[in-house]
């Protein structure tokens, strides 16, 4: 039996859990839906739902659509993938309904695109809906809306989606189930000497390098997307474990604190809902290069970014759009909402606050990015 490490004991008391199930955890070697395997996963999920609030982020719609349409392989073109997703999504949700209904649990289908969390009002609508479902004892089954999302079909976005959802619902734990045991020092399919990393204290560039290039042929995600999702969760104070969904009882072992898979320790504290939205739900539309003094004031002093600290502006963005803040070396250290558009910031960059009106002829705010609209990464 697996032992229990000190760092994982918090998983035993996790009350709100997000579980992401990858395509490869639902299909066999030929890419077909594996009913026996799904039933075993269903038992794990039912156990997890007892005494906990459970959210399931599930891949598999495209693979099920391929099977239902009798296609020899997964389409490579976007319309083909979207058609398969449209056919397969109903079958996927039906499978979850049958698994949970036998034990009196209701499920709710929730289809999301990145745009649903990009805009603040829609983000809050998603959050409030999921909160209401969980309060009612319903298990939300969430999937990327592949039928209408073009960009999201290009890579393993359900890993990213699961990380975002974990932040939206303020989860205690995120479990990413795949067809591999966790993060290895090499690709275990090619390197017999690759060793499993039991614990990752912080996702560094070296850790991300280990994840690069590990993927499979049925789903769209690889280890890189999983590690990045784990990093987002960890940064928000959420425990994350990447492990195999192909092993019966593995989810239960994770939530009992056993040493299985790769555990990503939380590195940050719980963010406010607004800070979490800025940090993880938004996609930057531009970049502001800041000087060392401004970086120190933001990171250590929790201060706003003033125009005087801006050294460069890249991109074409409007007021209120998300922008990344980078240091002189180009490293992103914060994300925020711009108080001025790109052209305005180019004109006032390096100027004192008192000079803004003289340069522009008007002044909206004293800051380039207000501290209430900033999230340090």
From Swiss-Prot:
Substrate binds at residues 59, 146, 158. It comes from Myxococcus xanthus (strain DK1622). Keywords: Amino-acid biosynthesis, ATP-binding, Cytoplasm, Kinase, Nucleotide-binding, Proline biosynthesis, Transferase. Belongs to the glutamate 5-kinase family. It is found in: Cytoplasm. GO terms for biological process: L-proline biosynthetic process. ATP binds at residues 20, 178-179, 220-226. Catalyzes the transfer of a phosphate group to glutamate to form L-glutamate 5-phosphate. It catalyses: L-glutamate + ATP = L-glutamyl 5-phosphate + ADP. Residues 285-363 form the PUA domain. This is Glutamate 5-kinase. GO terms for cellular component: cytosol. Pathway: Amino-acid biosynthesis; L-proline biosynthesis; L-glutamate 5-semialdehyde from L-glutamate: step 1/2. PANTHER family: GLUTAMATE 5-KINASE, ISOPENTENYL PHOSPHATE KINASE. PROSITE patterns: GLUTAMATE_5_KINASE, PUA. GO terms for molecular function: ATP binding; glutamate 5-kinase activity; RNA binding. HAMAP family: ProB. Its EC number is 2.7.2.11. SMART domains: PUA.
């Amino acid at each position: 039996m697996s032992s229990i490490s000190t760092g994982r004991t918090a998983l035993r008391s996790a009350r709100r859990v997000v579980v992401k199930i990858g395509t490869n955890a639902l299909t066999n070697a030929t890419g077909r839906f594996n009913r026996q395997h799904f039933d075993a996963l269903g038992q794990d999920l039912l156990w997890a739902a007892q005494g906990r609030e459970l959210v399931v982020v599930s891949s598999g719609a495209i693979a099920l659509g391929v099977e239902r349409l009798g296609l020899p392989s997964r389409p490579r073109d976007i319309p083909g993938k979207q058609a398969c997703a449209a056919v397969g999504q109903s079958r996927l949700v039906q499978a979850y309904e049958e698994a949970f209904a036998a034990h009196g649990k209701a499920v709710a289908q929730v289809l999301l695109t990145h745009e649903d969390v990009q805009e603040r009002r829609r983000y809050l609508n998603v959050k409030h809906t999921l909160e209401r479902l969980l309060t009612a004892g319903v298990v939300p089954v969430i999937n990327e809306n592949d039928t209408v999302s073009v960009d999201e079909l290009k890579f393993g976005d359900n890993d990213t989606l699961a990380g975002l959802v974990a932040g939206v619902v303020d989860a205690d734990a995120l479990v990413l189930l795949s067809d591999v045991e966790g993060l290895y020092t090499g690709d275990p399919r090619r390197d017999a000497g690759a060793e499993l990393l039991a614990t990752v204290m912080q996702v560094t560039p070296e850790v991300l390098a280990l994840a690069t290039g590990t993927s499979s042929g049925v789903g769209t995600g690889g280890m890189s997307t999983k590690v990045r999702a784990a990093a987002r969760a960890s940064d928000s104070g959420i425990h994350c474990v990447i492990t195999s969904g192909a092993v019966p009882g593995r989810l239960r072992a994770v939530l009992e604190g056993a040493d299985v898979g790769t555990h990503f320790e939380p590195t940050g504290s719980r963010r406010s809902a607004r800070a979490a939205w800025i940090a993880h739900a938004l996609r930057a539309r531009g970049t502001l290069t800041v000087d060392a003094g401004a970086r120190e004031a933001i990171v250590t002093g929790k201060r706003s970014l003033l125009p005087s600290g801006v050294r460069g502006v890249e991109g074409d963005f409007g007021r209120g759009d998300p922008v990344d803040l980078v240091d002189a070396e180009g490293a992103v250290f914060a994300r925020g909402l711009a108080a001025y558009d790109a052209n305005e910031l180019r004109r006032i960059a390096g100027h004192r606050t008192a000079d803004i009106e003289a340069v522009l002829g008007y002044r909206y705010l004293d800051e380039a990015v207000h501290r209430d609209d900033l999230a340090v990464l």
